[in-house]
Amino acid sequence: MKGSNRNKDHSTEGEGDGKRPKRKCLQWHPLLAKKLLDFSEEEEEDEEEEDIDKVQLLEADGLEQDVAETEDDESPEQRARRPMNAFLLFCKRHRSLVRQEHPRLDNRGATKILADWWAVLDPKEKQKYTDMAKEYKDAFMKANPGYRWCPTTNKPVKSPTPTVNPRKKLWAFPPDSSRDLPTPKKAKTEVPQLNFGMADPTQMGGLSMLLLAGEHALGTPEASSGTCRPDISESPELRQKSPLFQFAEISSRTSHPDAPSKQCQASALFQFAEISSSTSQLGGTEPVKRCGNSALFQLAEMCLASEGVKMEDTKLIKSKESDGGRIEEIEKGKEERGTEVEKTTETSFQKEAEFGKSAKGNVRESKDLRDIEQLQMDNVMAIKVEDPKEIRKEPEDDQKYSHFPDFSYSASSKIIISGVPSRKDHMCHPHGIMIIEDPTTLNKPEKIKKKKKKNKLDRHGNDKSTPKKTCKKRQSSESDIESVMYTIEAVAKGDWGVDKLGETPRKKVRPSSSGKGGILDAKPPKKKVKSKEKKVSKEKCSDITKESRPPDFLSISASKSVPGEVPEGIKAEPLTPTEDALPPSLPGQAKPEDSDCHRKTETCGSRKSERSCKGALYKTLVSEGMLTSLRANVDRGKRSSGKGNSSDHEGCWSEESWTFNQSGTSGSKKFKKKLREDSFLGSAKLDEEFEKKFNSLPQYSPITFDRKCVSTPRKKKKTGNMSSESTKTSKGSGDKWSHKQFFLDAIHPTEAIFSEDKSTTEPAFKVKNALSIPNTPEPTTMQEPLVGSQKRKARKTKITHLVRTADGRVSPAGGTLDDKPKEQLQRSLPKVPGTYCGDNCSHSTVEEPRSSTPDMPAVSAFFSLAALAEVAAMENVHRGQRSTPLTHDGQPKEMPQAPVLISCADQ
């Protein structure tokens, strides 16, 4: 509840400062950043509330600012909070009381209660506050002669620009940043094609990257697919850049099918993004084939592509000199393979069916796979060796073919070829392997064998993680939205997560495996592949690692590029310096991951409610420094929110703080504010004087308002449970009394339900009194102050601010909660009387409709049946738990929940 308070403060704070908004996420969100200014106002409903909120907001602006910031050039006048009016003074004076009674109540709810009280005050009583306000305003204007009454926007003069501009700058940045990358050949030619540039991740909030990824995945899949084909040379650079940046690029490009070969270096994540986007784009030609082929095949292909890409990346990086030639050759191979792959996929599936049954053959096949890998490695080597001229030609071919979705896979397959060295690829991607082999070097039969083996492996892997199949299917169902989801998940699981949080990938493994077979292998490939392989291939790994070394150059480089693949090459081989840091953590993580992955994959065919990557991305961002942990803010808010109790408020009234504390901000915040304000507000003296006077203002006890409520038909909300309860009864005051005391009884049951604090006898006694002596308010008993987390937890017993007012509206304190109580009242009224009063039942039931109907005419309109049902269920539980004697006549009748403190105001 205090959250709303906090939000307002932060938002305005962000406005005011532009420097340290409390909730940075708002700043990062491109849309929210602009709307920040509007939020606080949207929430204000009443004028009084608006005034209070404005004051609070204004206070918040300055309070949280660092002293240094507060002392900048701007005159204090611009920062000065507008002087409080009489009502605000009243609120400031009494908010602590409300807080005492309703520790869980948010600031707005408290203000509503205060507004009720204020309305009840006699003009004489109000006069003191009015005078004080006038005095203060005069003094304030003297102290701040240049002060101008701002429009209701609450924003200090400089506020909007700082928050918004940084964002604009960031966005303006992007086009250049991509060009800055030293992408020797294609990058420059192709970069201009990019639809948009990514902001430099170092200067950009992590969340914005996600947003961008989503936007671009949704908005520019086709255009970007064609546009972006970063060069191979570019990819190494990309790799050097943070994975986050790569991710951003990936999302921006929404990867182009051909891009994979070049981008493979960028990162598995990048590849994955490409794959997912390409799948969505492929929608036309290949998707059909792929869907037909089977989720498995697609999955394998994607995995292979991603892993192959990774491996290629490493290899390409290692042999940068020959990189262009190799890749291009690979690309040529890709196109050829693309056709082959389509053919082979069907054959592979048939064979898959044959081999799927025997997982036993996997071990043997693993050996075969090794051989195949070696062959493939040889092929790859050959490809690398090929002339750069060919390479140049091939890129052109690739570009030509890039238009065809088929080639996105073929491209990935090319990549995979070099990547094949790692068993993971084989395991994960039966098809990919086939693709990997050069059509020229490997005969189709060989490919088929490999495919069979891979299929078996896949099956094996799928046995472990059946979700894979489903995942693939999901991809085949490809939609832009899904691709976006994949991208984001990829990010969460991605290289980036891998680099930063070894753990993140684990968490993410399940989701990735769940929907994104490609992701499974592609980004987490480092980890996920590893995990799969570890399980599947650890048996084989011992052999494989040994044998894979012959192709060591490739396998090792691949393993280096894919830390997650450590099991194969990495275990035995040193990592490249850049990746050294990552792999060490990965192996350990990968192992736990193995079990996690499989477990998750089994459970998570499609991502149900279970989230394996809870906060992984967030953690990654935080660990990277892209995000500031929100925990500090939350904790601060909680700490302060709990402190809204009287002690804090009253203690805090001292000095200038009163001006800022009005909002009922928690004590800790108040103290900070005091210190800061002391330092920077020239009007400190004014505040001090005002503080003294302010403290001299009368502080009326809630009981006072209760009495007034009784005498005045106007609804008065009590702060105490008792007072609030009494106000509840008082809502109906005079007019309802005519309805009979039954009305009280009908209401009381529900009220009892809401106020559970008091002993059962008390309510009964009070009810009797109320009936007999309708006009005597019950003394309000203050709740004991809550400590620690209790302050933050809503207790059913504490929902005392949900009181129906004389007009039958729930008093505003609770907001929507109030409305529910009304419904609860309506529902419970009939039930309670029927259930608990034998003879009086008929009366109460008759009366209830009256009371509830008049009191809550529109309640039903506000709530859905489901909500009502929920309320009813809760009430039933309460009834079962507590029964208090209340009678229509004042005789004890069983009422649910003793704590009904009804000061018989409802007459």
Swiss-Prot record:
A GO term from the CC aspect: nucleus
Entry keyword set: DNA-binding, Isopeptide bond, Nucleus, Phosphoprotein, Transcription, Transcription regulation, Ubl conjugation
Spans annotated as Disordered: 1-24, 37-80, 152-185, 220-242, 435-483, 495-612, 628-672, 708-736, 769-854, 877-907
Regions of compositional bias (Basic and acidic residues) in chain numbering: 1-19, 496-506, 534-550, 591-612
Stated consequence of mutating P30L: In strain: C3H/He
Compositionally biased residues, Acidic residues: 39-52, 61-75
Comp. bias regions, Basic residues: 447-457, 790-801
PTM-bearing positions, type Phosphoserine: S242, S476, S483, S701, S789, S811
DNA-binding region, residues: 80-148
Cross-link (Glycyl lysine isopeptide (Lys-Gly) (interchain with G-Cter in SUMO2)): K384, K571, K693
InterPro entries (alphabetical): BBX_HMG-box, CC-Dev_Transcription_Reg, HMG_box_dom, HMG_box_dom_sf, TF_HMG_box_BBX_DUF2028
GO molecular function, one term: sequence-specific double-stranded DNA binding
A single BP term in Gene Ontology: bone development
SMART domains xref list: HMG (SM00398)
Major subcellular site: nucleus
Biased composition (Low complexity): 723-732
Database matches in Gene3D superfamilies: High mobility group box domain
Residue ranges, compositional bias (Polar residues): 152-164, 656-668, 772-783
Main function: Transcription factor that is necessary for cell cycle progression from G1 to S phase.
Name the record gives this protein: HMG box transcription factor BBX
Species of the source: Mus musculus
Gene label: Bbx
